[in-house]
Each structure stands twice: as structure tokens, then as C-alpha cells.
């Protein structure tokens, strides 16, 4: 923020915070009406137990900052499973989503608001790490892919993202009920876009 007073810093800190802090991201996307898994900010074991009692166990617990590729993420069957995580601030608790697939919307946005999108890709995660990407996405309805792209572009616009944005999403439901839920954001060249190095005109 101090540097931004002297020179243009892109993406701006006001956008980057939503890729750095998962709680801030969930709060902002929920305020925007973007579809997300059920979630809660939990300050202690009692709040985690209450959330688990409401949505059912197991659930996902994440550290708001510093997690990537499966780090800082746990499947909790009870508060005891993350008992060592307390003491560094609140945690993000989320419903364990019964997804049928995963996709990623990848786009680039200029400071003036122009957006170019690559085809929505389907992804396969192994132990929290992206292991396979297929573009265009397979196994989902064209309408679902179009909705995923619209969501990605809306997030980029409303957060004021510049540069590359990847929006990872879960695919849930079947047939006409198929839809996407936003999992995480990455405001950087992302592994779901590595295919563009050889598979697209621009990368």
C-alpha cells in the first residue's frame, strides 16, 4: 500500500487481499452473492463444534493464510482433529462438498477493465495438488462452463483484479441442476493454466 502511493502496483492490495486471506475472500464473495460452500468463521473449538452440528461432520477446516496445495487444509471429523491449529487467529470451516467434478476459470484483466478468458478447464486434484487439467472442460454441461466463466469474470471486475486470475470451483448436482461453487482464488499464473504454454496462442 505504501508503494502504491508512489508507483502503480498491480494487482492492487485491495484485490490481492482476497487471494491471500481465505476468510476475507469468503466474506466478500458471499456479500456479492457468488455461490460458495456453506462456511463459517470459527474462533475456537466450541464454534467449530456448533458449525459441525449444524451442517454435519466431517467438514473442511482451513487456515486463512499461508495454505496452498493441500497445506493448511484438513478434513475434520471432530474439533479434536484440528486441536493444534488454535492460537493464531480464527479458522475457516466449510462444508465437505459432494462434488462431481472440479473446474477452473482462467482469465486476464487489464487495469482499465478489459478481460480475456481462456476456456474453462476441468481439473483433477491428487492429495490437494492439481495433477490433471483438460481444456476445454469435459464432463460438464456447456451451460455450466459458461456460468463458471461468467462468475470468474464478475469476480475479476468487482474485486478490481489486474493480471491473471484463476477461480477454482466445485461442480455439484446433475443434469439441469448442475452448478458450480467457488472454492479458491489465485491472482497469479496458476497450475490450472499451465496447459496454455503449449495449448493456446497466449499464456
Regions found by a protein language model. Give the residues of each.
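Short, flexible active-site loops
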Residues: 128-137, 186-197
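Short beta-strands and strand-loop turn motifs
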Residues: 10-12, 61-64, 189
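Short, intrinsically disordered, charge-balanced linker/junction segments flanking boundaries
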Residues: 4, 193-203
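Thr-Gly-centered strand-to-loop micro-motif
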Residues: 12, 94, 167
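Internal, well-ordered alpha-helical scaffold/interface segments
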Residues: 146, 150-153, 167, 180-183, ...
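ATP-binding N-terminal substructure of ATP-dependent carboxylate-amine bond-forming enzymes
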Residues: 1-15, 31, 46, 50
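Active-site nucleotide/adenylate-binding loops and adjacent lid/helix of ATP-dependent enzymes
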Residues: 18-155
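Conserved metal-phosphate-binding beta-hairpin within the catalytic cores
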Residues: 160-194
Amino acid at each position: 500500500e505504501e508503494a502504491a502511493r508512489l508507483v502503480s502496483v498491480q494487482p492492487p492490495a485491495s484485490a490481492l487481499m482476497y487471494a491471500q486471506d481465505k476468510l476475507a475472500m469468503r466474506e466478500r464473495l458471499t456479500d456479492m452473492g457468488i455461490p460458495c460452500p456453506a462456511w463459517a468463521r470459527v474462533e475456537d473449538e466450541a464454534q467449530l463444534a456448533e458449525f459441525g452440528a449444524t451442517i454435519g461432520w466431517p467438514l473442511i477446516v482451513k487456515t486463512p493464510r499461508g495454505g496452498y496445495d493441500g497445506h493448511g487444509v484438513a478434513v475434520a471429523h471432530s474439533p479434536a482433529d484440528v486441536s493444534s491449529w488454535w492460537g493464531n487467529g480464527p479458522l475457516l470451516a466449510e462444508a465437505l462438498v459432494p462434488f462431481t467434478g472440479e473446474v477452473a476459470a482462467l482469465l486476464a484483466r487489464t487495469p482499465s477493465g478489459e478481460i480475456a478468458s481462456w476456456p474453462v478447464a476441468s481439473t483433477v486434484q491428487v492429495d490437494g495438488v492439481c495433477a490433471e487439467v483438460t481444456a476445454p472442460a469435459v464432463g460438464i454441461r456447456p451451460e455450466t462452463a459458461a456460468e463458471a466463466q461468467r462468475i470468474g469474470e464478475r469476480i475479476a471486475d468487482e474485486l478490481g483484479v489486474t493480471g491473471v486470475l484463476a477461480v477454482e470451483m466445485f461442480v455439484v448436482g446433475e443434469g439441469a441442476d448442475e452448478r458450480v461453487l467457488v472454492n479458491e482464488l489465485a491472482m497469479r499464473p496458476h497450475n490450472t493454466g499451465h496447459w496454455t504454454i503449449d495449448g493456446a496462442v497466449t499464456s
